Amino acid sequence: LGVIGLELGQSLHRLGVDIVGIDMAESIGGISDPDVNKEAIQLIGKEFPLWLGTGAAISEGENGQLVVTAGDNSKSVDKVLVAIGRKPNLASLNLEAAGIELDDRGIPVYDRHTMQIGDSHIFIAGDVSGERPLLHEAGDEGRIAGHNAVSASITAFRRKTPLNITFSDPNVC
């Protein structure tokens, strides 16, 4: 259950909507510390069920309902909120024709301190980098990419410490 799924799920739950949080990962809210994750799961799990570590399937149920199944769990629901992030849409750019090396996700290989793609005159910023699709990160990347795109020489910047904040209750940082 990622950051957006957790934030929206908890908000909807507190507005009276029956919620189940499902994720293939064993963590919630982007938490990387195992002890913090365990505590967060216990706290959030008191509010609504968390089905973690398993994929989910959706099928048609009775009376227009949907049936969500994840592992041994199953629930009939009226609506499903899918918060799975987004994949950068680069395929139509045919970057390979420009000699741009792509990683195994189809994202250009770039220097995160200059935002320069390889040795090219192309710079990358924002969600398309596939690194941290967050507004404040995109702003930082855009500042670096823009500076280097118009400068006579490329400058490697020291990136800001990435913030990972989930606006849940309790807040998770």
Descriptions of predicted regions:
Residues G61-S74, V80:
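Conserved beta-strand-loop-beta-strand element in the redox core of flavoprotein oxidoreductases
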Residues V3-N63, P133-G139, H147, S151-C173:
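Rossmann-like dinucleotide-binding cores of NAD(P)H-dependent redox enzymes
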Residues L1-G2, D127:
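Glycine-rich Rossmann-fold phosphate-binding loop(s) that bind the pyrophosphate
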Residues L1, L15-D18, S76-V77, D119-S120:
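Short coil/turn connectors at secondary-structure junctions
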